[in-house]
Amino acid sequence: MSLAMLTRNMLRRTSVRAFASSASNFTAGKDSARKLSPEEAKAEAAKLAIQSLKDVGSVFSSGSDDAVQPIDTRPVFENPELFGTLNLLHQGQVLKELQEKYDKNWNKLTDEEKKLGYYIAYGNWGPREKFINWNTQEAPYDLPFRVPSKVRLSNPQANDVVHKLEPLYLSETPVRKEQFDTSKMDPVTKTFIYITLFVMLFAISRDKNTGESGKPQEIIIEDRYMKSKLEKEQKEKEKEIEEENRKNQEKQARRKWYYLWLK
């Protein structure tokens, strides 16, 4: 038996064994699979979300892998103000752990977990960075109603008519006026506007100063075949006109000779 035949038989046996082992693994995995409960499915979805955030963070991260590695969230639960300093990946990790606690019995939440949840929703970070009274008993600065409420009657009854409160616009509250001020622009927008105006003025001045002499020359591409064809047709027309004129002249000349002969 040659070496090529031995090699072919060995490859055939190896491929058959590999296929048999993969088929057995697939059957075992299929038998061991079971339907996940809603809690387990939610946990698996959270794991996939964290893994996706890790993958995205690893793509945009130019430093070490510490920025995409899980962190110890205990200091964040103890001091909620640290949440605003975390990157997007670590904030997602904290939110995931906090959501897992919220999905369970709310009565078992600790004060630290409640404070962290309140800080994430109403704390002085991001759009609410100037809300410095988040950890006090005072009402939020943009509360949509007055505190304390104005009572019209000292002894209200069940049949009293209740009137609608006057609307309170959040954009007019003192802490929100600067955020909703549309007359101001950020430096980046101003820079782009100034660059656009400069380019427009430069283009207008250049158009005025350049005039007709600076206009770009139009390149006309001539078709030599078509040009020669038109010239040939023009010559043929001229030749036909000349021939027709010559015939008319001969006709008139013969007519003159005829009239003279009659006289």
Swiss-Prot record:
The keyword Metal-binding does not apply. GO terms for cellular component: mitochondrial membrane; respiratory chain complex IV. Gene3D superfamilies: Cytochrome c oxidase subunit IV (1.10.442.10). InterPro entries: Cyt_c_oxidase_su4_fam, Cyt_c_oxidase_su4_sf. It is a single-pass membrane protein. Keywords: Membrane, Mitochondrion, Transit peptide, Transmembrane, Transmembrane helix. GO terms for biological process: mitochondrial electron transport, cytochrome c to oxygen. It is found in: Mitochondrion membrane. The chain crosses the membrane at residues 188-204. Pfam families: COX4. Residues 1-26 form a transit peptide. Residues 232-252 are annotated as: Disordered. Belongs to the GEP7 family. Involved in respiratory growth and required for cell survival in the absence of prohibitins. This is Genetic interactor of prohibitin 7, mitochondrial. It comes from Clavispora lusitaniae (strain ATCC 42720) (Yeast). The gene is GEP7.
